[in-house]
Amino acid sequence: YSEKFKYVLVDEYQDTNKAQFTLITLLSARYGNITVVGDNDQGIYSFRGADISNILNFERDFPGTKIIKLEQNYRCTGNILNAANAVIKNNTVKYKKELWTQNEVGELPNVFCGDNEYDEGSYIVEQINRLRREEYFKYQDFTVLYRMNAQSRAIEDILRRENIAYKIVGGLKFYERKEIKD
């Protein structure tokens, strides 16, 4: 079956599991033309079965591999990358790399650790209101990003309590979801 696939490309390889590794190995067996893109420092899906050893053992599993490290970051400021490098250096098993940028140093990151999701929601709204007062922003100038839709409830509850209009892009507001309305 691998005859059908002259080239195999896998994105987010750090998030692959054992079954996907086996499939990738079988599909690329005939021609050996395999390209993967991934970052061992972004492997966060072990709870879903992802196996970080897939990317860490890539050179061993696919002999003749050439690793190209993309260490220059075009989006973040220097201070954001300094914080990222400080966290990444604690990874015990990894490919060695040092992220860098030609961008400005930028502001220092602000870290808030709330006791729960409602503390986080309150903090977000407090910061929005502070910036509106001090910097004269409008509500429409703000965007709140979250990783999972389940995180929206606490933020939405606080926004509703404070009578702040908002919209959800790419989904439904928590209280408009079918399973909540029923």
Which residues are covered by each model-predicted region?
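Short beta-strand->loop structural element characteristic of the AMP-binding/adenylate-forming
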Residues: 44-46, 165-168
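Conserved RecA-like P-loop NTPase helicase motor core
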Residues: 181-182
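Conserved helicase NTPase motor core
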Residues: 1-57, 69-76
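Glycine-/small-residue-rich beta-strand-loop submotif within the FAD-binding core of flavoenzymes
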Residues: 60
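Short, acidic/turn-prone active-site loops that include or flank metal/cofactor-
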Residues: 40-41, 170-174
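Helicase P-loop NTPase motor core
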Residues: 63-66, 71-166, 173, 178
